[in-house]
């Protein structure tokens, strides 16, 4: 139903019943043998690797022969993969030779580690850049580079490059689906129209999280290290298109839309009308400019002695600048395809970026102390009909920051010239904040916008705008849709807390509680998200159950958010999707009504 048409059985032959089902359903299968010597890679030296030690030839052939003979009659198998991440050498070549001889040359042999295509029939890559894909598919210069300088394929000779550019191409792994993401699927999908491009396999299908029982008797999903083991991969085992409970991630929906826009599951998921609630919110959204100023500002809101808003109507509310997000697994990625400080006009050889391992975006943000942003009051000048607040926001001991000039103006909820459906009986406050940066900000920032905080965590959200969780490189499906969800259901699925609730293109948002409703009507372009926990609380938690019960709700209104990418094990979010600190103005209306 997702439009998936092929399976790679990484990294060993599957249960036979899976192949029976694949035959029946019509799925293609890349049948992968049980060979992997990843631990011998070391510093890319492959010292004493069994793949190139003739004493291991019989074992390699035994595993290859057993896999083939067991499954040879399954119509779903389109090629035989020798194994995974085992370097290269004489034993893998012998296994490929056996398969070719056993099938009288008809069998298609795959193995990603044969970078020079000495014994396989398909050129295969893991996590290539878009430029690498384009280079492999471009046969105008048969001897041009086929890989970024740091990849082993960059060193192959001209004869190998000619073989590569005449062979079918497949990405045996791409778009590492770990945590929020992966971003960038659409660009890879566009390249798959080339006649030599056979497609690719996203890593991977399902999170490998297991149930554990907490001291209080609750059951929770767990990952590496949660069972007392000393050697583990943490939550690196949670990198599926669906979580351990088979719930698709937001990035999965974006990937399906890019690869299979007519997939049945997308039709089943199409948005339905919200009837009266939708009609009312759309009427409000269409009249954002019709809210007229009224009287004294104190008639709609309460401010402290420095001009900071404390409540609108009877609802306590605070407003702050926000530039940090709880890092995603991709924000924490350390791979060499790093686009930090890189321009879209110069991505380096075949899109390599900095080409340096080791430093993640999350580390850079935290080294810049963006998570510790502090404000300093700089004045509250009096202006007719509005409250003005001037602040400076900066990390501790930093030589950069921003000046925020807030204007708070009471407006009439009856909305002059608007239909009755758009009338609001309550207190309304127009908010305008001008953000002017100074000093040298980090090359990319997590976000820039406003964070509101209101009491209580039992809110129901209804909104007009993008209905799906989406980011600049992870587009949604319905930019002018209507959504409705409980606060707890607004965030992406997954076992480890991280950024994962942003919806761009907000036109109007209503949060309904037990006694009142908060309505937010943008007057400038912005996205939104909401959570009972702050970005720092989310960032510090290893599991959702580590978060204490909350009695407040944070609402983020973002002018910009950084892209997602797939750097947990692949390329960074590309520069064109990056968030940068620039001067910007945000405007919105806050209305509080009794229920």
Residues of each region from the PLM?
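Extended substrate-binding grooves/exosites of carbohydrate-active enzymes
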Residues: 1-282
